């Protein structure tokens, strides 16, 4: 393709102010995307080529394991989501689904995911075990009503995703296929030139028995990955479990009440009273809002040197109640005032807080749901709030079980913790960008949407189901996070918009012009994905743009063209070959094969 006639570059000289991370900056500056509105982007021709190459890699790999491509509607009737009991969770409060009504007043949602639609279709077309297993996938635009879109294509309102759904006759068959898809994902990401790590993950709103995320390690990642150096364990922070460090025992001479004026935080209490955070139990108040029932107040207790994992807490509370949990909110002073709770000792609460403290609350259950983390429940002597403003006290041999506490894992695992499968290994931490997620859904959706099949004995059974997502546009941006330098993008050759760019330095020179056309046409004939920068701009402008857009190889046609010589440059390592034009194609093919093989 030629820049002047079919492939305008649209590069920028200045870095857009709204771009926070390097990959977002480079996508905008190099002209790959254009911002239309917050979280909404146009994919320019050069970006579309990247997306198409990523999509092709995905299709080849998924087709090889027996998956079939289709295309599902983006507009979903609300009744399907109400059958699965996800409508309220996805549209109310902080729900992420854009929703609307048609002129007849019927409700619809713009799809962030397609479990309901595909399960409904499966219930109509699959009726026998002889038709199983089946796996369908699509690559198309998804929508999320993000509260705060940021980081370009990482967290946008509209994005391109591959989502797949498999149906099985047994849990065993589902588990086997789940592993097969996991292996295919590893091949896909490797073929895209990415370094990834697979981690145990929380299933979130999609649900299911187990799930695994695939992360690109990058400093700009929003997710924290905890892992061992040996590779024996890896999980995201929402899911990770570990053995915490041992607490420092409280001295025998410390007892009774401790005056702690205006000392509401663990840090303040420790600093003013010569204590260690591991000697304190902090009590955090949450309010759980459900789809159908009054709000439930939660007392969550954890050791002072640990942090509550709100995802684990959310999942636990959701399991305890029959109604769907919509959201979990930490209670601050303002909420206490709104609920007419006078003299509520927020900041000085202890684990023995009485139910009487919430009797006057409106719309709340009148009994605390009490939960304590394992690490805190084993403390025989500790300090906590005295349920009186400006006071803490020492607790000794406090019985959490007699106070109806559930003892559960609600803490964040962290760097330096030992792992449960081998207490000789410590957790390390790094940041990651999620680009893929696979789930074993079990029968969650088939039960609710009545998707059944007849087994070999003629009995009707619910289908077993898995789902598998890849963020296509996320892969593109994550690849830039892992592959850039101070000059611009350094694309892995497999997903680069072009393999090579030809840059004539002076098109007014007839020798250069003729040699440029000869090389360009020769590369086209040999099916090389080539871009010709045939602009009349200065050579320096062309060089700068070529480095910015990041095409793996550059062919410079300059003054040496009079001797039929050109320069071949590798973008990633700046290796340069000054060679005769008739050896150029052979040299390029050899060097590009090395690059392809490096990432295969």
Swiss-Prot record:
Q: What is its EC number?
A: 6.1.1.15
Q: GO MF terms on file?
A: aminoacyl-tRNA deacylase activity; ATP binding; proline-tRNA ligase activity
Q: Where in the cell is it found?
A: Cytoplasm
User: What are the recorded Gene Ontology BP terms?
Assistant: prolyl-tRNA aminoacylation
Keywords, ordered alphabetically: Aminoacyl-tRNA synthetase, ATP-binding, Cytoplasm, Ligase, Nucleotide-binding, Protein biosynthesis
Q: What's the superkingdom here?
A: Bacteria
Q: Which PROSITE patterns match?
A: AA_TRNA_LIGASE_II
Kindly give the InterPro entries that the UniProt entry links to this protein.
Answer: aa-tRNA-synt_IIb, aa-tRNA-synth_II, aa-tRNA-synth_II/BPL/LPL, Anticodon-bd, Anticodon-bd_dom_sf, Pro-tRNA-ligase_IIa, Pro-tRNA-synth_IIa_bac-type, Pro-tRNA-Synthase_IIa_type1
**Pfam families xrefs:** HGTP_anticodon, tRNA-synt_2b, tRNA_edit
Record's GO cellular component, any one?
A: cytosol
Q: Which reaction does it catalyse?
A: tRNA(Pro) + L-proline + ATP = L-prolyl-tRNA(Pro) + AMP + diphosphate
Q: What does this protein do?
A: Catalyzes the attachment of proline to tRNA(Pro) in a two-step reaction: proline is first activated by ATP to form Pro-AMP and then transferred to the acceptor end of tRNA(Pro). As ProRS can inadvertently accommodate and process non-cognate amino acids such as alanine and cysteine, to avoid such errors it has two additional distinct editing activities against alanine. One activity is designated as 'pretransfer' editing and involves the tRNA(Pro)-independent hydrolysis of activated Ala-AMP.
PANTHER family (alphabetical): MITOCHONDRIAL RIBOSOME PROTEIN L39/PROLYL-TRNA LIGASE FAMILY MEMBER (PTHR42753), PROLINE--TRNA LIGASE (PTHR42753:SF2)
Please report which protein family the annotation says this sequence is part of.
Belongs to the class-II aminoacyl-tRNA synthetase family. ProS type 1 subfamily.
Q: How does it assemble?
A: Homodimer.
* Entry domain remark: Consists of three domains: the N-terminal catalytic domain, the editing domain and the C-terminal anticodon-binding domain.
| Full protein name | Proline--tRNA ligase
Q: What is the organism field in this record?
A: Prochlorococcus marinus (strain MIT 9312)
Q: What gene is behind this protein?
A: proS
